[in-house]
Curated annotation (Swiss-Prot):
It comes from the Eukaryota. Coiled coil: none annotated. GO terms for cellular component: cyclin-dependent protein kinase holoenzyme complex; SCF ubiquitin ligase complex. Pfam families: CKS. It comes from Homo sapiens. This is Cyclin-dependent kinases regulatory subunit 2. GO terms for biological process: cell division; fibroblast proliferation; meiosis I; mitotic cell cycle phase transition; regulation of mitotic cell cycle; regulation of transcription by RNA polymerase II.
Length: 79
């Protein structure tokens, strides 16, 4: 990964959600709030680009530059 680029993981799934993680360059990661999960407006302002429906659902304390996202699977794909 280039140090100035945002990296998007492949998507992975469980019975209810589709997941992906996004790795920010260290400089950008300094702008990630430590007190709350980001709204879509906040993560888009950082330059993260994804389709609609993704939610920042967890803060990974050891690596705050990695943003964890999920969105519900369509009903017909849920187990």
């Amino acid at each position: 990964m280039a140090h100035k680029q945002i990296y998007y993981s492949d998507k992975y799934f469980d019975e209810h959600y589709e997941y992906r993680h996004v790795m920010l360059p260290r400089e950008l990661s300094k702008q990630v709030p430590k007190t709350h999960l980001m709204s879509e407006e906040e993560w888009r302002r950082l330059g993260v680009q994804q389709s609609l429906g993704w939610v920042h659902y967890m803060i990974h304390e050891p690596e705050p530059h990695i943003l964890l996202f999920r969105r519900p699977l369509p009903k017909d794909q849920q187990k």
